[in-house]
């Protein structure tokens, strides 16, 4: 046991160990045998279905999705650290897969915390129903790039997209590149 292990909860250690076996038994053998797929630019040629299905089987694809929708909730006070521990372990096998799962987790938290019940039902339903469904989000602007990490009102932020509340909803004006 390392010093780092002593700061993890028992659940985090268990989840990390499950992910470690997943990487050793599934991800690394696939990468070793199919390293040339890294250069296949077609979506269907990259990550085989069974990898996401296996990530679903060990319970990491739907982390952060409320249990009432069929997901796996985490203790709020440990959620971010749990995501970090698991993503680090997955990235040991394939950083691209880790990034895909991190996007699921980030968007799940945003939906859970900010979306209407209707949107939660719609999008969590899609994620739970289809083991190959992945969430994504778009954050950059022509002048903003990584400014998304700054506070929304930071004077040095170059993000131009604005949202304005109007009768019946919101109007969002901005530009993606």
Give each language-model segment a name.
Residues 1-102, 119-129:
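Amphipathic, small/basic residue-rich leader segments at the start of a protein or domain
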């Amino acid at each position: 046991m390392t010093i780092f292990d002593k700061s993890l909860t028992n659940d985090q250690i268990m989840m990390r160990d499950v992910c470690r076996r997943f990487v050793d038994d599934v991800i690394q053998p696939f990468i070793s045998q199919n390293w040339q797929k890294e250069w296949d630019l077609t979506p269907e040629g990259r990550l085989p279905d069974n990898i996401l299905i296996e990530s679903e089987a060990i319970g990491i694809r739907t982390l952060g999705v409320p249990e009432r929708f069929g997901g796996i909730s985490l203790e709020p006070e440990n959620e971010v650290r749990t995501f970090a521990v698991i993503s680090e372990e997955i990235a040991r096998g394939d950083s691209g897969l880790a990034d895909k799962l991190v996007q699921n987790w980030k968007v799940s938290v945003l939906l859970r915390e900010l979306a209407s019940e209707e949107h939660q039902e719609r999008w969590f339903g899609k994620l739970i129903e289809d083991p190959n469904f992945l969430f994504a989000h778009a954050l950059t602007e022509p002048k903003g790039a990584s400014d998304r990490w700054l506070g929304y009102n930071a004077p040095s932020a170059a993000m131009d997209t604005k949202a304005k509340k109007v009768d019946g909803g919101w109007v969002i004006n901005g530009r993606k590149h």
